[in-house]
Amino acid sequence: ILIGLVGSEMCIRDRYKSECHHGTAYTKMMADYSGIHSEVRYYVPLNKTYEVWNLSVTNNSDKARSLNITGYAEFTNNSNYEQDQVNLQYSQYITKTVFVENRVRQMIHANLDRIEDGKEIDNKDVVNRFIGLAGAPVDSWCGDRGEFLGEYHRYGNPVGVESGKLNNHGNYNENSCGAITTVLELAPGETKTIAFLVGMIDNETAGKIVASYTDTKAVCDKELEELIAYWHGQLSHFQINTPSDEFNTMINTWNAYNCFMTFIWSRAASFTYCGLRNGYGYRDTVQDIQGVIHLAPEMAVEKIRFMLSAQVDNGGGLPLVKFTHNPGHEDTPDDASYVQETGHPAYRADDALWLFPTVYKYVSETGNVAFIDEVIPFANKDEGTVYEHLKRAIDFSMNHLGKHGMPAGLYADWNDCLRLGADGESTFVALQFYYAMTILKEFAAYKKDDEYITYLDESQEKLGKVIQELCWNEDRFIRGFTGDGQVIGKRDDPEANMWLNPQSWAVISGFASDEQADKALEMVYERLNTEYGAILMDPPYHAHAFDGALAVIYNAGTKENAGIFSQSQGWIILAEALKGHGDRAFKYFIENAPAAQNDRAEIRRLEPYCYGQFTEGKASPNFGRSHVHWLTGTASTVMVGCVEGILGMRPDFYGLHIAPSIPKAWDGFEIEKDFRGCHLHIVVKNPDHVESGCKSLLVNGQAVEGDYIPKELLSEQTEIELTM
């Protein structure tokens, strides 16, 4: 939105002041210039599919003012990124804009406006976008980007705004836009409110939308109240008060909100992914679910069902789940058609293994153990209970073992830059597999499936012996084996001799002995930790990468090549917390927490309220610079690491463990938690300033042994006091 003073020069920078405030699902920008104060609130109304730009302008001067207000939206010429940005010989000749009443209407494939409703030509029909104005009359408009900007002009000085009037022309071919100008007359001290509405919807509906904002201020205020109430309601199910403001703001608001964004969008919509990704990544989406289970289990279970329906009947996950996913009728990576359509040529070793902790966390949070008997179709054919789906995932790993008896790395094993194939083996996946069997034994015990428990016991023991004999290397776990048997990540390798994830997952899985856990975690701290978090491995690949070590394509200290891959920070937080190392767990949190980096924003560069995919590591000259914001698995792994690890909220099928692992400097903390229809007020006291451990536990004044609270002891309003 551009504000011009009629008959005056464009904005002079040193007289202009502005602020930008971000809230849950809205952004507010404020500016002051030449006695004019403006505030614009950007948001999408609850359960709507268009955007509102709600502008209030106040004349703080002592004279009447006449202001040109221009709202501008630059439309793409096609909803597909490649068609819009690359195939210009097509996309620049299918659009036009026209003015209708109080809005600029863009039409893609406008020449198809005479075909019958419901009919398409070459799978194409007219697509409509609009920008409309409510609360004031339209003075002038423009629908052509080139004419709006003007020759030799830029977005800071578009010719239409400089001249005070747009040219009332639409575009026909080339580049569309929607620009609308209105003139506001303001007496001294007067405020006026208008709204620009932007969306992709048919013309008739667009007209009704704009008309519904006639009482602009009242409608927008009400919508924002509803939006804020919705999000605060979602976040209110788990709130904390600790001695750390950074920890509080991330867990209570911004990490939680980030988790909802990744849960909703997966990796499908951002300026980084470019809107080109044509589905949900299996591992990404299943992990994202974990971040919202403690806040919105009813939302989480719907996505769990969806992802279970994207599991192939052989137990593997579809690497990419199409937006048009049709359970029971999908092609798989075994079919050439799937590979051609999605670009994913093979299964990944880890995809289905993420189901185990995710399903377990949902059932434990809700107590809905009966969920494992729910019947859900497989992606390609047949159906089975959730329990059967999990058993098939075990079968998939069992049927894809390498020559040592560990899971094969296949096309990738979480690390997309490790191609181990059908013969190479992954320690990371082996530890995931070990953990999956531990979880499934709990479900099998509930099912009284003794025969299967015996099978899992024997299989887990066999796998454990292999990991112990082949993967422990004095003070660390190796990363795995190449297809020809070469060890990845052994102590004397010249490059990549220390890896983060096998160490954290050796602890998370419950495999590592106390001695191994302490040694491995200490090596992580000594070798991998930095002031911005732990790097993924060290030293970076450069001259000694094996054929499947694709990380070597990246510059040293970048992404998988010894960058600080932020998703892994959540796992090292959890691992340290599970071992009772509260100081270390919190240190890893604070090193990578967005809210703790405002004093070095010029280095980090990302927003101070959301996580990024990675931070450049110590081998980079830009050490500390972060990238790929919002849509990252970091949101969920850090949330789990903090809630289950540092705060110690660890439910199981029948109750709740409270086992905090906190900085010893903390005197204590409080939690407000909704849990299975009960509201828990939890007070943790730390008079002896220890990092972990439970000295006493009171539930509604009743002493309870240990740190475990059976569900039967909980009431509608439950008071819990734990002394460390």
Language-model regions: role of each:
Residues Y72, V86-N87, L318-P319, Y434-A551, ...:
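Catalytic cores of carbohydrate-active enzymes
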Residues I1-G7, I12:
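Single conserved hydrophobic/aromatic residue that forms the stacking wall/gate
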Residues R65, L184-D202, F433-A436:
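Short Pro-Gly-centered flexible turn/kink motifs
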Residues E225-L276, E302, F306, F396, ...:
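Low-complexity, Ser/Thr/Pro/Gly-enriched N-terminal "stalk/linker" regions
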Residues E616, P621-W666:
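Catalytic cores of secreted or luminal carbohydrate-active enzymes
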Residues S270-G279, L320-Y347, A379-T385, H404-S426, ...:
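Carbohydrate-binding/catalytic loop surfaces
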Residues Y280-T285, I289-A300, I304-H404, S426-Y434, ...:
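Aromatic-rich carbohydrate-recognition surfaces in CAZymes
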Residues M29, V44-V159, S163, G207-H237:
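Polysaccharide-binding surfaces and accessory modules of carbohydrate-active proteins
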